[in-house]
Amino acid sequence: MEDMFSPLIEVENLRREINRHNQLYYVQDNPEISDAQYDTLIRRLKELEEAHPELVTPDSPTQRVGAEPLKAFGIVNHPYPLLSLANAFSDTELEAWYQRVKKLLGNIPFQIDCEPKMDGLAVALTYRNGKFATGATRGDGFQGENITRNLRTIHSIPLNAEPNAPPVFEVRGEVYLSKNGFAKLNRERADKGLPLFANPRNAAAGSLRQLDPSVTAERPLDIFIYALGYSEDSLLPDSHWQILDYFSKIGFRINPLNRLVNTLEEAKEYYRQMAANRASLPYEADGVVFKVDSVSLQHRLGDVGREPRWAIAYKFPAEQVMTRLKKIGISVGRTGTLNPFAVLEPVNVGGVVVKQAALHNEDDILRKDIREGDTVIIQRAGEVIPEVVAPVLSKRNPESKPFRMEESLFNPNLNRTACPVCGGEIYRPAGEAMHYCANVSCPAQFERQLEHFVSRGAMDIRGIGESLSVILAQQGLVKNVSDLYYLTTADLLQLPRMGEKSADNIIDAIADSKTRPLDRVIFGLGVRHVGNETATLLSRHYGNIWALAKTGLGELQTIPDIGDKIASSIVAYFSEEKNVAVIRRLEEAGVRLTSDQKPVNKNMPFSGMEFVVTGKLESFSREEAQEKIRSLGGTAKDNVTKATNYLVVGADAGSKLTKARSMGVKELSEREFINMLEQS
C-alpha cells in the first residue's frame, strides 16, 4: 500500500513546490532557487508522470505545453461583455470625463484607480473550483476565441487558484511581450531567416493565435491582471483597488505601477510621470487608464454604447524621434497631383521603420519651414501615418534654402518647370494648394489610376497591386483600365517571375470583378473629386453609367452633397471621348454598369439618417458596414458633422468619438448596430 501511494505523494509535493516557485519567479520576481534546480524539479515530475500516466492532471505544471495542434479555435461567450474604453487625448478631455462622472454621481466623492495602459492583447480567464478552466480573447466584446491551451503556456497565469478563492470567477488581463522579450524573439527569428515582427503587440497577438500551443510556449509572453470580470463570491470588497490587491495575494500578477488617488490633479500628475518615463518602461504602453474605484459607483454609472462611463484611457502623445531629411521627392498622383514627400534616414518610430513621410503640399512645407538636409522630428500620426512634425532649427545648416516647388520641378533641358516623370507642363489652379501635371497621358498618372481601379475600395482585383500595376502599364499590356478585361493567361506569362497558376488566379480575379456594384465602378474610374461616398450617391440617383454620362451640370447640382466643383468635374470627365470609349469597352467586356440597389425612398428603414462608422468592427469591415447602411436608404459619411444622426463605435475609436460626444450625437455599439440591421 505504501508503494502505491508514494508516487502520488511525491507528485503532489512536486507540483506544490513547482507552483510555489512559479509564483516567486513569474509573479513576485523573487526566485529562491536557480534555473538548474527548477529544471531538476520539472524533470523529476515528468519522470513520475510518464511512469504513472494515471496521475497526470490538466493543472499539472508539465501540462502547460505539449497538446496536439488545433485545427481551429472554438468560440467562448463572455458572461459579461469585455468593453473597450473611451479615449482622451488632452487634459481638457480628461477633465470633461471627470466632470461628467461627478455630475452623474451627484457630486458623491470618489477615488480614481490609475493604471498603465498596456499595449498587448486583452484576455478573460475563468476559474472553476480552483482550476483554470477557460481563457478567451476579447473578440467583439460578447464572444471571443477559446485560446485556453495557449494561455496555459504562460507561466505567470496560475493553473490553480488558492483554496480561499471564489468557487467560480473570471479575471481580465493584458497579455504582452516585454521589450527585452520582443528583441530576443526577433533576434531568434532573424537567425532562422524568418520574417521579423513589427512590434511587441503584433508579436503577442500572433503568439496567442497559434493553433499549436508548443509554438506559443516558445514565446516569452507575460500578463498583468487588470480587472475582475465576475465572481460568485458576494463578499469581495466594493473597491477595484482592494479586489486587485486580493487577487495579488492569491497568486495573480498585478502591475506594481498601479496607483490609487483622491483627486483629478493627482491623476494628471500620475499621467505626466508615466508619460515622462514611458521609454524606460520594460513594456510598451500607449497611455494611462483611469477608473472610478468604487464598484457600486461603477454599476451606478453604467455603460454607453460599448464603453463604461466609469473609465477612460488617456493616450500618450504620438512617439516622436529625430532623423535627417535627405531629400524632398515629388510623386505624381492619379489625377496629376504633384505630391511632395520626405526621404528620410531610416528610423524606428513606435516599432515601425520609417523611410518616407508625407509632406502634403508646398504651403504646408513652407508653413513648417522644412528644408532638405534638416534634422526633423518624425511621428506616426494616429500611431499609423508617418509625418514630419517640425525641423530642429538648432541643427540646421545655415546655408540651407527654403523649399520651392517650382525650383524643385525646374527642368534645365526644357528650360521650364516640368513633371518629373513625363516632362509635361505644370500648373496650380487658383485657390488650390496642389500643383498638377497637365499631361493627361502622363505614364505615372495612369500607373496610379490603374492601381486605384484594382484597389480594394474599387474593383478589388486580387493579385494586382502597386508593383504589378506599374509592370502592366510599363510593358504596354494595359493602356487604359478596360484593357484589363481583355488580358489572357498568355499575356501575363510574358511578365518576369509570373507562374501559370498565378496568372490563372489573376485572370479569374479580373473576371470576378465584372459583377462589382456600380458605385465601385464609378469610384474606380477615378473622376476627380469623386470619392466613394459621392460614387454611391451617383449610383443610387442614376441607376446606370449612361444616365450619369448624359447628365448636365444643372441636374447634378440639385443632388444633395454634390457641389459645383464635383459637378463640373463629372461633366468634364464624361465630355472626354476617350473616357467614354473606355466605358464602352468595359461594357463590351461584360462589366456591370447598372445598379441593383433600389432607388432611395422615404419608406426605407434608414432613409433620412446619416451614419459615421469609427473604430475597428469585429463582424464586418468599415466598408461593409457603410454598404449595409446605404442599402437600407441611409447615408454613410466619413466625418462627424451637425447632420450626423448615429456614430457606430468599434474598438479603439478615436477623435471622431470625442467630437460626436461634444455634439451630442447618438452612439451605437456594434451589437446595437447589428440589432438595427436585423430589425430593418
Swiss-Prot record:
Q: Which BP terms does GO give this entry?
A: DNA repair; DNA replication
A GO molecular function held by the record: DNA ligase (NAD+) activity
Q: What is the lineage of its organism?
A: Bacteria, Bacillati, Chloroflexota, Dehalococcoidia, Dehalococcoidales
TM region positions: none
Name the protein family. Belongs to the NAD-dependent DNA ligase family. LigA subfamily.
Q: Which GO terms describe its cellular component?
A: cytosol
What function is annotated for this protein? DNA ligase that catalyzes the formation of phosphodiester linkages between 5'-phosphoryl and 3'-hydroxyl groups in double-stranded DNA using NAD as a coenzyme and as the energy source for the reaction. It is essential for DNA replication and repair of damaged DNA.
Full protein name:
DNA ligase
Q: What is its EC number?
A: 6.5.1.2
SMART domains from the entry?
BRCT, HhH1, LIGANc
Cofactor entry: Mg(2+); Mn(2+)
- Catalysed transformations (reactions): NAD(+) + (deoxyribonucleotide)n-3'-hydroxyl + 5'-phospho-(deoxyribonucleotide)m = (deoxyribonucleotide)n+m + AMP + beta-nicotinamide D-nucleotide
Per UniProt, NAD(+) binds at D35, A36, Q37, Y38, D39, S84, L85, E115, R138, E174, K291, K315
Q: Where is the BRCT domain?
A: 601-680
Which species is this record about?
Dehalococcoides mccartyi (strain ATCC BAA-2100 / JCM 16839 / KCTC 5957 / BAV1)
User: Keywords for this entry?
Assistant: DNA damage, DNA repair, DNA replication, Ligase, Magnesium, Manganese, Metal-binding, NAD, Zinc
Output the SUPFAM superfamilies linked to this UniProt entry.
BRCT domain (SSF52113), DNA ligase/mRNA capping enzyme, catalytic domain (SSF56091), Nucleic acid-binding proteins (SSF50249), RuvA domain 2-like (SSF47781)
The record, for NCBIfam families, names: dnlj (TIGR00575), PRK07956.1 (NF005932)
